């Protein structure tokens, strides 16, 4: 296995600087706000107005007074922003940037699954389609899943989907059973303890921090488990000088930016598993971000009836996580 190296912030070339200036000008002209997830490339994060995890970005989308929302993320995120702001223009740099986790839970199959447990409350991860959100009672994110489930009476059955690893983590934290949909994020599923242990041996003083979408075998060895936002906050306040980070490596940019004196090592992936980079997030580029502001396309459109159903479960999440 190739020796791992701590993350360094990449330099910005002249073309990226020119694009950044043009994006900033177009943003002012359009009265737009640019929201970007931590997993996007550093250049995107540098020009964004808000960089955050799913919950932070949903809140930013809900409260903005901008006329145009540009969402650099994957499709369900732009869709959520449109559901929260039906009267605003919502753009995505590339609306073909989907989420395999969300796609692993088709609405018709999930509906049939739900019908097997008619008395169950449905809590769905925000990494899901508008159709699934409309089928759900409450939405959650990785940062508030434990808190939201903890507010449900212990005698109430819960269906949790689509991420089985996040669901399993919530079950372990609260010592309660839930009925899990068997979906997963291919990035986080790619981490195994056998491989990460090699990084731990290479960096014995580093803390292992992991996202709850990782498998249990990884979480059981982690010094801290949390959403991307929580991992970022922990890396800032922890006295540790080095961290092995088991989540999509886009977060390393913000970690290094906030704590330049610390070392951040992307956790190695299982060599027999899928890649540990979210290729869909990387479809957001400076070129297509600039182009979407220039052409005001592609725009996100959500059916009004579907949006109304999905809005109820999203609003419930926001109410329960204040």
Swiss-Prot record:
GO molecular function annotation: 4 iron, 4 sulfur cluster binding; metal ion binding; quinolinate synthetase A activity
GO CC annotations, alphabetized: cytosol
GO biological process assignments: 'de novo' NAD biosynthetic process from L-aspartate
UniProt keyword Chloroplast present: no
Binding site for iminosuccinate: 37, 54, 125-127, 142, 211-213, 228
Residues the entry annotates as binding [4Fe-4S] cluster: 99, 185, 278
Cofactor, how bound (note): Binds 1 [4Fe-4S] cluster per subunit.
Catalyzed chemical reaction(s): iminosuccinate + dihydroxyacetone phosphate = quinolinate + phosphate + 2 H2O + H(+)
EC number: 2.5.1.72
Keywords for this protein: 4Fe-4S, Cytoplasm, Iron, Iron-sulfur, Metal-binding, Pyridine nucleotide biosynthesis, Transferase
Localization of this protein: Cytoplasm
Spans traversing the lipid bilayer: none
Pathway it works in: Cofactor biosynthesis; NAD(+) biosynthesis; quinolinate from iminoaspartate: step 1/1
Cofactor needs: [4Fe-4S] cluster
Pfam families assigned to the protein according to its UniProt record, in alphabetical order: NadA
Function of the protein: Catalyzes the condensation of iminoaspartate with dihydroxyacetone phosphate to form quinolinate.
Entry similarity comment: Belongs to the quinolinate synthase family. Type 2 subfamily.
Name the UniProt record assigns to this protein: Quinolinate synthase
Taxonomic source organism: Prosthecochloris aestuarii (strain DSM 271 / SK 413)
Gene: nadA
């Amino acid at each position: 296995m190739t020796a791992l190296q701590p993350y360094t912030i990449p330099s910005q070339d002249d073309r990226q600087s020119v694009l950044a200036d043009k994006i900033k000008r177009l943003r002012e002209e359009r009265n737009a706000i640019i929201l970007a997830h931590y997993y996007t490339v550093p250049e995107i994060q540098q020009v964004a107005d808000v960089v955050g995890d799913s919950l932070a970005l949903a809140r930013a989308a809900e409260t903005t007074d901008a006329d145009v929302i540009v969402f650099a993320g994957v499709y369900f995120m732009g869709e959520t922003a449109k559901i929260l702001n039906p009267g605003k223009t919502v753009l995505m740099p590339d609306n073909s940037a989907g989420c395999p986790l969300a796609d692993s839970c088709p609405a018709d199959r999930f509906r049939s699954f739900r019908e097997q447990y008619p008395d169950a409350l449905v809590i769905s991860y925000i990494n899901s389609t508008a159709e699934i959100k409309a089928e759900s009672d409450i939405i959650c994110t990785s940062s508030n899943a434990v808190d939201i489930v903890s507010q449900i009476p212990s005698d109430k059955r819960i269906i949790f989907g689509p991420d089985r690893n996040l669901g399993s983590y919530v079950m372990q934290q609260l010592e309660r059973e839930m009925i899990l949909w068997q979906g997963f994020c291919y990035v986080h599923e790619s981490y195994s303890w056998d491989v990460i242990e090699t990084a731990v041996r290479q960096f014995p003083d580093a803390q292992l921090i992991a996202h709850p979408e990782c498998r249990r075998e990884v979480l059981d060895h982690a010094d801290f488990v949390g959403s991307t936002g929580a991992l970022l906050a922990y890396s800032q306040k922890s006295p540790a000088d080095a961290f092995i980070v088991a989540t999509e490596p886009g977060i390393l940019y913000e970690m290094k930016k906030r704590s330049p004196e610390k070392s951040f090592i992307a956790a190695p992936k299982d060599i027999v598993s899928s890649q540990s980079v979210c290729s869909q997030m990387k479809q957001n580029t400076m070129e297509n971000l600039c182009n979407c502001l220039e052409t005001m396309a592609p725009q996100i459109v959500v059916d009004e009836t579907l949006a109304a159903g999905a809005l109820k479960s999203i609003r419930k999440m926001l109410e329960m996580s204040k």
